[in-house]
Amino acid sequence: MPIEFVCKIKFAEGEEAKGASTEGGGTGMLDEGLRRQKEGMADLASFASSSSLHGLARALGTSERLGFRQTLWGLALLVSLGLFLYQATWSAATYLERPHLAALREETRRELTFPAITLCNVNRFRFSALTDADIYHLANLTGLPPKSRKGHRPSELQYPPPNMLDIFQRTGHQLEDMLKSCNFSGQNCSSEDFSVVYTRYGKCYTFNGNKTSPKRVRQGGTGNGLEMMLDIQQDEYLPIWRETNETTLEAGIRVQIHSQNEPPYIHQLGFGVSPGFQTFVSCQEQRLTYLPQPWGNCRASSEPVIPGYDTYSVSACRLHCESTQVQRECNCRMVHMPGDADICAPSKIKCVDKALASLQKSTGDSCPCETPCNLTRYGKELSMVKIPSRGSARYLSRKYQKSEEYIRDNFLILDIFFEALNYETIEQKKAYDIAGLLGDIGGQMGLFIGASILTILEILDYIYEVAKNKIKQLLKPKKSQKQTNQRNLIQEQIQRTKNLREQNLKAQLTAGAIATVRFEEVKVKAANDVAQPHSAHPTSVLPNHHNAQQAVQQDFAC
């Protein structure tokens, strides 16, 4: 007859809780959103701990809850980042303002190219050279009343159509008559060394205007440049009958010093020289270099030149604008203006004056003349002495067969020379270029956050990986609704079974459990214990009704 033992068994409360937890973990599923959030925090912590950005590892190097030290490090990192962004923004704004500065230096040469000298008599027409037809046609220009034969009105007189170019050539002051003496660097010169050029003053003359082989000087000071004695011929000046836009009240010559690549714009850029004086003009060459856009507004030499000129200059641009405006409103051009249009007749002088006045009143948008990026100009200093002296007046009177009064009223001496064989260079330079910007930002980045370009690449690489994973999750194909329903049903069944087991286990833990052990099973257990003396935990003969999947240590008493 089998012998039965009645034992009261009570499970360890901690171990049972552990077993219940293990069972629940094996069958339950974590919330997907929570899992992804934890994974993201872990990835961020891993990136922060390996990043070369100073302070990031101390602030975000762990996925645990932020502590006091981590909070302080995070605040320090944010403040440093804010200061860096402020300084970097200020540096970028300064760069976008395109600041520049001017660098001035002086250089010396063994020889310098002498500038071109253009001179004009302020009187356009010689009175003695005007014919009746000239006076008739030039009435609107000169203000002189036309001559009329006895018994005929001026409107009845028949004259050939005027040719303004021919009129300027015939009636302008001739240089061979005005030039009394000429000397350049100790060598005599004559009217043949001058070329004819037409300006608003009519027929003018340019010395050293050859672009290919300009004259050069090897010494500075008086006597080492151009020295001329001129007779302005005041007795040939037109009498003033009435004032017009072309009427002049002064006597003398107009002079402009310019480079060979620049046409004369003498009515605005020239200076006057009076008779009865010797005028000394000390020059200094200035070479200017401007910055192109966006740092400046100069015109680069690579841009197309203005039609009619070999090189671009402000004077050429203004003359081109004037010619275009006059051709647009009057269908002609003045003698000194470039172009292929017909030369305006004297009857269109009022139209020309109106067109030029409208151009002058414009704001410059209709004719923007930019400064060339490379420009040569000449600074001037003028001084004068009176001529002739009492001792030389009689000598000059005998030499030129003129009265002393005529010499005082008409003669002048012009002396143009270099002060020294040096020139000034005025160059615009970038005050803050891209190299300075990158240097400032790099220094600020290292000072405030201890980062570099490679650190930025690390952050971009991390952002790329995170974005790639997010996109993969969004593009991952979803399961069918049927599979989803089946999965939900299985999860509900598992949860129901889990709850039922937890209730039974809780009841057994509270009231204790009764187990029946047969005597034969005890003997089998003893035999097993003898066969396995080294077992750390002897095998229990009690049936395990509490956890069918894993063994549980049990304490019992019979």
Swiss-Prot record:
UniProt name for this protein: Acid-sensing ion channel 4-B
Gene name per UniProt: asic4b
Cysteine disulfide links: C120-C204, C182-C189, C298-C373, C317-C369, C321-C367, C330-C351, C332-C344
Keywords: Cell membrane, Disulfide bond, Glycoprotein, Ion channel, Ion transport, Membrane, Sodium, Sodium channel, Sodium transport, Transmembrane, Transmembrane helix, Transport
Molecular function GO terms recorded: ligand-gated sodium channel activity; monoatomic cation channel activity
Pfam families, A to Z: ASC (PF00858)
Its membrane topology: Multi-pass membrane protein
Tissue: Expressed in central nervous system.
Localization annotation: Cell membrane
